[in-house]
């Protein structure tokens, strides 16, 4: 409730400085074991019992004026006794939040004198952001009532009678009282004033055969109109009230039986256990999991090979390349070999651990290395393409044989040319047989025959050409396919001319035969 913290108040939430009004705040009330009942005996100045005092602090719930239930601290105290053989008593009921701020409080005091009984009541309620104090005094048949309203801000640091009970128990646990601290309080007339707390040291009390050390705290309510009201509290270390003395009164309240002193629970640190080496092979559970996982992976591998028969071929190809190239770094070679088969190809190497980047290497060096790797890969692909092209060229080359002549040609040439060449050679052989006899021709006819019609000359030329072709190197044929095609076409043109000449010779032969028949 305050902003200033001084000295030991910080320990348990009381805040004040010398001459200042303190405020209350304590977040760990439940940790101090403050919830317990206690009973004290009221004794006269002669030591005779006159009654008893009961105090209890417990957890409770409070319903505000709009019907909302909240958790709170419930303080209840009551006393019954005799004063000059007249019955007297008091009661207190208060609701506090965890910051010891008052939510509602009701108090009552009475003395039943034979002639003029007296009764005094006072209630403090929090309504609409302000505190309403209602006080009534009844003497005989006459009753006086007064109502006072205080803004909520003016009650900052207010210590009610209920809060005083809890605050004393907190002081007992801490064995300390703030020096020079002031709090707000209400006097017996219901007017706002201030109160102070002061430590009176320690004292030993003996109850029966037991002794205990008590911490003494004095509270003084400084009324502006009346004399100060002081009360001394003798507190046991666990917060129990062992004795209460009102200054100026002959009587007192004291315990008759020593309570069981409770000590604050000491939280022990959790035990530390040395880490033992884990031998999974000797652990039945872990070894069982290992066998199950091993069998699962084996079945998964077998299932994958059944559904992907091409995997065996890929492995075989890899082993073949491995034996042929014999790389120094087998792991990197395997990564580069199987990289094209990856489902998601990334620009980084498949095995990043083989190329761990140095923390001191710049990104430019890394990019240069990646570019260099890509260039080497492209060169390897080009070499493989060239080798594959040479193999395909050898397979596509065809050899055509006609007698002693060999004609090399590619598949790109027109198939109609092949048919034409074969038909031509076939017809030519038949015609040569019919013209071998030179006597069948007249001299004029022979003279009219062109030099190109001489079959012997043609055959010699062809033989020479074929011999030249046979002597050419196979590499020249492969490299000069266009030249060979031109030569073949030239031969075809010559043969076409010779064919036309042969047609003329055939017609002449027909005429000669007819003349011979007529002469016969």
Swiss-Prot record:
Belongs to the CATIP family. The gene is Catip. It is found in: Nucleus; Cytoplasm; Cell membrane; Cytoplasm, Cytoskeleton. This is Ciliogenesis-associated TTC17-interacting protein. It holds the Pfam family CATIP_N. One of its GO terms (biological process) is actin filament polymerization. Interacts with TTC17. The keyword Glycoprotein does not apply. Residues 365-409, 428-485 have a biased composition (Acidic residues). Residues 352-409, 423-520 are annotated as: Disordered. InterPro entries: CATIP_N. PANTHER family: CILIOGENESIS-ASSOCIATED TTC17-INTERACTING PROTEIN, RIIA DOMAIN-CONTAINING PROTEIN 1. Its main location: nucleus. Residues 504-520 have a biased composition (Low complexity). Keywords: Cell membrane, Cilium biogenesis/degradation, Cytoplasm, Cytoskeleton, Membrane, Nucleus. Signal peptide: none annotated. GO terms for cellular component: actin cytoskeleton; cytoplasm; nucleus; plasma membrane. Plays a role in primary ciliogenesis by modulating actin polymerization.
């Amino acid at each position: 409730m305050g902003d200033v913290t001084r000295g030991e108040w910080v320990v348990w939430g009381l805040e004040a400085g010398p001459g200042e009004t303190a405020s209350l705040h304590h977040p760990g009330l439940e940790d101090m074991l403050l919830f317990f009942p206690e009973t004290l005996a009221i004794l006269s100045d002669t030591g005779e019992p006159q009654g008893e005092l009961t105090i209890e602090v417990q957890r409770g719930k409070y319903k505000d004026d709009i019907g909302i239930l909240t958790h709170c601290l419930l303080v209840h105290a009551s006393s019954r006794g005799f004063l000059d053989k007249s019955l007297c008593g008091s009661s207190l009921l208060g609701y506090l939040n965890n910051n010891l701020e008052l939510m509602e409080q009701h108090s009552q005091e009475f003395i039943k004198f034979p002639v003029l009984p007296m009764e005094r009541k006072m209630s403090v309620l929090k309504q609409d952001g302000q505190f309403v104090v209602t006080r009534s005094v009844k003497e005989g048949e006459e009753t006086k009532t007064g109502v006072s309203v205080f803004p909520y801000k003016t009650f900052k640091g207010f210590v009610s009678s209920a809060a005083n009970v809890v605050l004393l128990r907190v002081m007992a646990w801490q064995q300390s009282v703030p020096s020079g601290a002031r709090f707000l309080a209400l006097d017996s007339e219901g007017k706002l004033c201030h109160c102070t707390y002061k430590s009176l040291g320690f004292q030993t009390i003996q109850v029966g055969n037991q002794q205990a050390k008590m911490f003494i705290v004095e509270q003084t309510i400084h009324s502006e109109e009346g004399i100060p009201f002081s009360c001394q509290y003798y507190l046991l270390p666990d917060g129990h009230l062992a004795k209460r003395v009102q200054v100026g009164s002959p009587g007192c309240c004291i315990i008759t039986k020593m309570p069981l002193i409770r000590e604050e629970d000491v939280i022990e640190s959790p035990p530390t256990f040395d880490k033992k080496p884990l031998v999974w092979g000797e652990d039945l559970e872990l070894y069982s999991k290992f066998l199950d996982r091993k069998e699962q992976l084996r079945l998964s591998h077998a299932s994958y090979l059944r559904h992907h028969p091409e995997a065996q071929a890929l492995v075989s190809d890899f082993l073949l390349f491995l034996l042929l190239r014999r790389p120094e770094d087998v792991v990197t070679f395997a990564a580069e070999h199987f990289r094209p088969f990856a489902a998601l190809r990334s620009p980084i190497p498949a095995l990043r651990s083989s190329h761990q980047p140095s923390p001191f290497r710049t990104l430019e060096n890394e990019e240069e290395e990646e570019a260099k790797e890509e260039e080497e890969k492209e060169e390897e692909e080009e070499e493989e393409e060239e080798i594959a092209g040479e193999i395909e060229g050898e397979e596509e080359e065809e050899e055509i044989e006609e007698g002693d002549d060999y004609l090399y040609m590619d598949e790109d040439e027109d198939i109609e040319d092949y048919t034409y060449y074969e038909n031509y050679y076939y017809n030519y052989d038949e015609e040569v047989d019919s013209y071998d006899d030179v006597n069948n021709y007249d001299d004029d006819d022979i003279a009219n025959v062109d030099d190109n019609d001489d079959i012997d000359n043609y055959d010699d030329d062809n033989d020479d050409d074929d011999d030249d072709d046979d002597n050419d190197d196979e590499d020249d044929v492969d490299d000069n396919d266009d030249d060979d095609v031109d030569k073949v076409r030239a031969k075809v043109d010559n043969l076409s001319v010779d064919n036309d000449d042969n047609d003329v010779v055939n017609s002449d032969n027909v005429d000669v035969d007819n003349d011979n028949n007529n002469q016969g």
